Amino acid sequence: MGQGQGTPWIQSTGHISTQKEEDGQKIPKLEHRNSTRLMGHYQKTMNQVAMPKQIVY
């Protein structure tokens, strides 16, 4: 199950990055700060879920 979850997570992170760049211009700074907090949360979760072998791209 851990390996299966890893793939979607990576794809989701990529999607979020793309949206952040596009929406970042229109969205206020307040929203931008929220996005940064979300990104930090995702990174923490990925560190816990993703295993050293998975990190290798």
UniProtKB/Swiss-Prot annotation:
Residues 1-17 have a biased composition (Polar residues). GO terms for biological process: symbiont-mediated suppression of host cytoplasmic pattern recognition receptor signaling pathway via inhibition of MAVS activity. The keyword Transport does not apply. Keywords: Host cytoplasm, Host nucleus. One of its GO terms (cellular component) is membrane. Residues 18-34 have a biased composition (Basic and acidic residues). Residues 1-36 are annotated as: Disordered. It is found in: Host nucleus; Host cytoplasm, Host cytosol. May play an important role in promoting lung pathology in both primary viral infection and secondary bacterial infection. Belongs to the influenza viruses PB1-F2 family. Is not encoded in all strains, and seems to be dispensable for replication. This is Protein PB1-F2. The lineage of its organism: Viruses, Riboviria, Orthornavirae, Negarnaviricota, Polyploviricotina.
